[in-house]
Amino acid sequence: MDLEFFNRILSVDSTSGKEGGLADMLSAEFAASGRKVELFEVGDGTKNLLVSWGTPKLVFCTHLDTVPPYIPCHSERCSGSDASDMAFCGRGTCDAKGQIFAMWEACKALEAQGCTDFGLLLLAGEETGSFGAKAFRDQHPGAEWVVVGEPTDNCMASAAKGTKSFEVAFEGKAFHSGYPENGISAVELFNDFMSALRSIRFPKDELLGETTFNVGKLVSDNPQNILSDSLTCRVYFRTTFESDEMVCNVMKNMAGPEAKLRFGRPRVQDGSDIVAKDVAQWQKAMTVKAFGGDAPTRFETLPGFETKPVSFGSDAPQLNNFAHKILCGPGSILVAHRPEEHILLSDLKQAVANYVRIYKTLMN
């Protein structure tokens, strides 16, 4: 394996918006060997990169960008029982520059064996909305198979959760915090909303498990001695096949003076709910804007590979110009986006073998 090349990939800061530099570096590297290399403008200053051998029927695909901040990379020997292994540490090592490197090594191995009709597709903007994947879908006919590289511990993902994003806003009434009875705190309205949202029982999916949500971009810019007159936030759901439509309906029907959903308060005695007849104050003060997202996705799997469901998103749902999709790659999602992000050399080697095996299983 050309680890010097991997270190060069890791040395390029390709945080979202800056991935064009990595695309240029890789396109020059790949074209120098006489391979067919194409760059596709995404429309926001970034580029997608496609390397082709023959007419691709199978395309290996991952993304160029990484989440901020850029963390310089280094390698170190593992300790204990893994002393013969090596860890590459830093931003993008497993999400997704490890995938870029492993897929490139697999392509070189297939080329050396005289194989053809495959490609390597590197996309911009996966971490910020899959803008590269959406652009490529509209620019290119695709192929029969796409193998999307994400950190799945070298397992084949059987399915992935969907995503749904909503902007939520509350309008309060500012007042001196010593006399809260004369105002309406948008923060308290938000707290009531969160209590109601946590009380909703979304159905558990047999394959993807529970529906979860996270709150981000929370803003209430009031002084500490004045009741908040406004609060905005984003609520981001990870949905399942059972809950995807329900999440949209819940968020649509819980806001505004004419909200269809009613929420109550727990009985002190037995913990059961008293269902309110009227729309709650927090509902009347609440507005919701839906930003959409991806539906939960089922993936193709092959005999002999370990499989598991995953809870993260990828470019795969946007790549509808491919008939069949596989999601598989080295590294662990549990260290992606974190300061301790890393990938093992042994996992990279296993990924190369997996990608070669996938090609031979599907194309032979």
Language model: regions and residue ranges:
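Intrinsic disorder/low-complexity segments
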Residues: 74-87, 112-115, 277-286, 295-297
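Short, conserved micro-motifs enriched in small and acidic residues
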Residues: 88-101, 127, 184-187, 342-345, ...
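Glycine/serine-rich anion-binding loops at beta->alpha junctions
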Residues: 68, 87-102, 176, 326-328
